Swiss-Prot record:
Phylogenetic lineage: Eukaryota, Metazoa, Ecdysozoa, Arthropoda, Hexapoda
Chain residue ranges for the region called Bridging helix: 939-951
UniProt GO cellular component terms: mitochondrion; RNA polymerase I complex
Reactions catalysed according to its record: RNA(n) + a ribonucleoside 5'-triphosphate = RNA(n+1) + diphosphate
Provenance organism: Drosophila melanogaster (Fruit fly)
Enzyme class: transferase
Highest taxon listed in the record's lineage: Eukaryota
One of the protein's GO biological processes: transcription by RNA polymerase I
Positions that bind Mg(2+): 565, 567, 569
Protein name: DNA-directed RNA polymerase I subunit RPA1
Positions of the UniProt region annotated as Disordered: 1337-1428
Amino acid sequence: MGSKRAMDVHMFPSDLEFAVFTDQEIRKLSVVKVITGITFDALGHAIPGGLYDIRMGSYGRCMDPCGTCLKLQDCPGHMGHIELGTPVYNPFFIKFVQRLLCIFCLHCYKLQMKDHECEIIMLQLRLIDAGYIIEAQELELFKSEIVCQNTENLVAIKNGDMVHPHIAAMYKLLEKNEKNSSNSTKTSCSLRTAITHSALQRLGKKCRHCNKSMRFVRYMHRRLVFYVTLADIKERVGTGAETGGQNKVIFADECRRYLRQIYANYPELLKLLVPVLGLSNTDLTQGDRSPVDLFFMDTLPVTPPRARPLNMVGDMLKGNPQTDIYINIIENNHVLNVVLKYMKGGQEKLTEEAKAAYQTLKGETAHEKLYTAWLALQMSVDVLLDVNMSREMKSGEGLKQIIEKKSGLIRSHMMGKRVNYAARTVITPDPNINVDEIGIPDIFAKKLSYPVPVTEWNVTELRKMVMNGPDVHPGANYIQDKNGFTTYIPADNASKRESLAKLLLSNPKDGIKIVHRHVLNGDVLLLNRQPSLHKPSIMGHKARILHGEKTFRLHYSNCKAYNADFDGDEMNAHYPQSEVARAEAYNLVNVASNYLVPKDGTPLGGLIQDHVISGVKLSIRGRFFNREDYQQLVFQGLSQLKKDIKLLPPTILKPAVLWSGKQILSTIIINIIPEGYERINLDSFAKIAGKNWNVSRPRPPICGTNPEGNDLSESQVQIRNGELLVGVLDKQQYGATTYGLIHCMYELYGGDVSTLLLTAFTKVFTFFLQLEGFTLGVKDILVTDVADRKRRKIIRECRNVGNSAVAAALELEDEPPHDELVEKMEAAYVKDSKFRVLLDRKYKSLLDGYTNDINSTCLPRGLITKFPSNNLQLMVLSGAKGSMVNTMQISCLLGQIELEGKRPPLMISGKSLPSFTSFETSPKSGGFIDGRFMTGIQPQDFFFHCMAGREGLIDTAVKTSRSGYLQRCLIKHLEGLSVHYDLTVRDSDNSVVQFLYGEDGLDILKSKFFNDKFCADFLTQNATAILRPAQLQLMKDEEQLAKVQRHEKHIRSWEKKKPAKLRAAFTHFSEELREEVEVKRPNEINSKTGRRRFDEGLLKLWKKADAEDKALYRKKYARCPDPTVAVYKQDLYYGSVSERTRKLITDYAKRKPALKETIADIMRVKTIKSLAAPGEPVGLIAAQSIGEPSTQMTLNTFHFAGRGEMNVTLGIPRLREILMLASSNIKTPSMDIPIKPGQQHQAEKLRINLNSVTLANLLEYVHVSTGLTLDPERSYEYDMRFQFLPREVYKEDYGVRPKHIIKYMHQTFFKQLIRAILKVSNASRTTKIVVIDDKKDADKDDDNDLDNGDEVGRSKAKANDDDSSDDNDDDDATGVKLKQRKTDEKDYDDPDDVEELHDANDDDDEAEDEDDEEKGQDGNDNDGDDKAVERLLSNDMVKAYTYDKENHLWCQVKLNLSVRYQKPDLTSIIRELAGKSVVHQVQHIKRAIIYKGNDDDQLLKTDGINIGEMFQHNKILDLNRLYSNDIHAIARTYGIEAASQVIVKEVSNVFKVYGITVDRRHLSLIADYMTFDGTFQPLSRKGMEHSSSPLQQMSFESSLQFLKSAAGFGRADELSSPSSRLMVGLPVRNGTGAFELLTKIC
């Protein structure tokens, strides 16, 4: 037992603590003092005192034993050390030292905060260490009140009693529990980090104690410096010094003196801020030592040679890169010692070599040379941490390079374990093996082996295997005795094999021997295909040994789980080496248990391609077989059964005994259902729709009535008592589809039965297809002459729609001549970057109609051969292979080719391909292919088709790395989340993330039938198979059920009585008694409570009220009772189900009252069986369920299908925004607010007002004339006339009026224009101010040199273009520009400048508004306009300014610019500035649109977010249903729970666009994890900072940074997270590791 305990101590660590060795501890650990950088002598022997001294252990090919422990191979190595000449900073702590020095005065060494503030911080840190997290947080809230009270002795201890009772209570708590390191959670870690960071914030400029200027220490160029003022220098060197202030480098020994003084004053504070100071086992308080010496290094540890082995290049020994760093340190240390020796005794004591080294040092004086030598030593020590910290060090590996990145020590070796007993080869398909089998080549079966203990029961079999030896299967490779010694079985010595076999059980005293036998049929192997994106990527298969094969043989059904095909894919096989591992592989990881995908609970396994065709042909009506064929096919499907097969009677007796194809399948189903279970009943549908079977007019029945709809048609599948009565079985029933036959068999009888059925179907379909055959011919794709003529006619028409599409995009009423249309099209392309989008939309809308006409003409009625005789249609409609799009491309046309959702772009020449003319309007030039594969396509069409294929390949290649990193971030954060025995979901530090997994506690794989009407019908039809009487009797507890039903009745009664608006009792009390509150200044805020005085008066009244009155209020306005599952745990109380399940039961009972008790019992039993099992690693499954489907998404940003091209970020970029970045500045923020009924007109006005408008949207043209004037000096003269569009043109889109435009021009725009001109002309702002001269007459200038002028952006077309109002496509760039404009917007952002819509309900007819406003505001605003004009004219550059005072449609300005400046390009400046100048904008909102939602509601959608602005329009908008995609904005406004729901909805919406479904339980778990601490935290390095496991942090990324933090704070890792346990070689505590098994031996 003693040895067992010792093994537990060493092999099974319980926790791991990070600390720092002191110099004394390093010397004690060291076995040699390293004094020379020379490693080997001329003979290749290690030099004593060198870096490969034999006392530190053997190295490389050295055969000498270790000089310390005298071992050779087993020597772990021993540390050495280097004595440094002077202290250097420990590079781990240098930044922390800098932050620490900033809060202390370096004159008096006092802390720069009040004593009671310091005491509170210390108290908070002690509370956190003791595990009192809530109390520490309360103290943080309480701190502001205490700090506000200006009493220094507020928290001082007097006679053992605290002055403040709250503080006293905290100290009493600490007396109970001073330190509890096991309470380390992510909450405590994040709170401790926050408090520490706040305590280390830089404070005032002068010391609060000695009143001297603070020396703020900075970290510059990897050194600590502080600024020395002139006064400091004069004080040191005398009053006559004239030197100015300068930066002074702080030497390590000087800094150490500072910190020792600080520690002497504040030992407890420093130990709490830097816990590592109190962890050392060495007494650091004796002599001149101090715990803060840990921040510095006098002695440098040297790693053993085994950690830096020598490299052999041929016969030459080559040093390790890390050894080179140590050599550099030794050399620099030697030079430093030379300088120190010189400073002590002069040159006389130096050797010639030392003198030479001294002279080569940079610096004039000895002190300067000492600084140079010390700095070199410090840099070389820093390189030991990170080689990138030195520019000179080109090679070498620091600690950072050793442990970080994928190839680093942690991820490559400590996390990535390499395994034996594995095989890898190519996979090939095999339909003849079972679904849960894997075909293994016999060469693998002989090499892989399994250890079997020899017992009396298996010795005979094992002896035969030993006799066969390693080369004959089944054989054995070697025998292992009780001591672990292995004896290889010889292949060429039969007599020795015989003797080894006889000795297997010869002497029981020798202990149990173990025979390593070959792989046998039925052994389980773990198959894995990389990338392993989700749980089914590794499954357990039973081995089937195949002789003469070289590849793995895999069943088709498993391809989807592995995402495998047979085009050269390779897979790995792993052979479990213990009975526990085999048990898990057989029962948990096996194929039968992985039939459903954890992502959404849908099936993974299913038959494909040929088997689907065969199944349809076999089960089609009219297919009959004689007795021989019937029994042959049944035997093919059931050959693996080891019991009597039940056969069905024939369908037809006369004239011949025949069985239908349906009966063959029915026989298989009946025989596979286990004995004792009721047979399956199923009503379902086939994939082939009923209309496809109606190829001719139905024949009226001889007797009876016509069946209605699809009744009794082949599209309706009906199974009764296990017999297929109606319908064909196609992909819908035995493919990887939800609620098909295989899925229903899985639900009723389990995975083994469904897997067996799949295997049986595979074999019978394979055999039948060999009899029946299947092929495609040209006849299957040909269309009739009539259809082909119609097709050609439609194609001729569609080739001429190009001009119409362009005219519609240009908004031309009449279609102009072709040449003129091309010119306008070219001008539109140049002018408006959004024109292409509009043109694409017009082309698509026109061409879609023609495409649909062609398809409906040719398919399916236009085909020569009709379904089901048409094999291509049979293949597509049954789901075997292909889609209707493929058949259309073959027989009809290819249609429009799109690249990233757009038509192929034009080159700079205006051509899409060189074979087209510039700006050609034909659909063909835009990628519309009217050809088909049957008759061939043109070269241009082929090129467009290849472009689309190339886009898919590029997108796949690029997104792989993005989605891979996304999944890694998810996995590393969520790896510790698992279900516990109380059904809560907790992290590895025991933090509760969810009280019920997925909010209902149900496992996704077991709850797929808790769904719709079909599921309830199916479950009741098969109630006898689900509700087995014995099980129901054990589960059903009438007493428990009565309690649950009483609670549910209580909830129902509350729901009936609940008022329209839910309010609390206190709210009603306040409304009734608000008149009785009498307080002075009722609206004044109490700074202590944050409440109004009036509200505090109401609270006092409520507190004074009688208990009976309060009880009456509470009874009348009672809250809704808690849900049943919150009161009665589902695993303990029979009948406790979620609200959703309760609703399903109630709805079904209303439809079928007779089955009320049946469906209720079914759902209750299924709830208990479907609960998530304790130990289930739900975090990993959720991460995989997001990461795996993300590989199917593209990287592009798609557009909102509405007016104004509202951009919406989708795909991986949006997932990264939400999950990895948790960004508060998302790329496309938006709001969706429903419009109240009857408010559409007012909502339209609001939409117009919300649209942001730039000056470019309002300008018709700008005319610029350039001249030269000579008076008063030579200068350029610019005359600019700005002509604005009439308001009728833009009033439907923008809420700005002409008067406001003019006001914006002379108040803001011209200031910006002058500033831009001066900037381009290299004129500084200072020059502009200095050059101002006396005002000259504006009209005095000559215009002798006037140009003809040019017009910027003249537009003769209609200017009502939505797209021109849009800002730049690049949202990020737009954001930057908006930030840059903030200072400019201050000039015009007051209420007079920008029209604001206060209440749209007050607006009357627009025409009246216009007239009244223009007339009414003129008189009020004239003064403001005149002053603005005066300010503009006061600028020296402005010579004249005038504007249209009547209609406000133009303004004109004349500017002068000295010829001393570079002549600017005004055209480009104005164009750029007009596009950036915002005339009107509601803050943070660019534009708005109105669209119709899913429920036919009208919604207002905004590009940008301003929730506060929306609150002003509560009469128009339904603010109770406001939604925004900005999670931070929702969290700030509505709280973190609302934000959590937005995360779920947003991630779900991202996947929904691609037709991907992810179960809500996964999303809710991720959302709850990200909002765990009340804030929205990303799944990134920033979010990982809050983890309580340092090893988990280091295994993610930035390993060195997290290692520094763990060492500095002296953190301990309890080895509870999966990553930390893997790193130290322990099994993870999830899954089967969550518990231990106790075996009953006797």
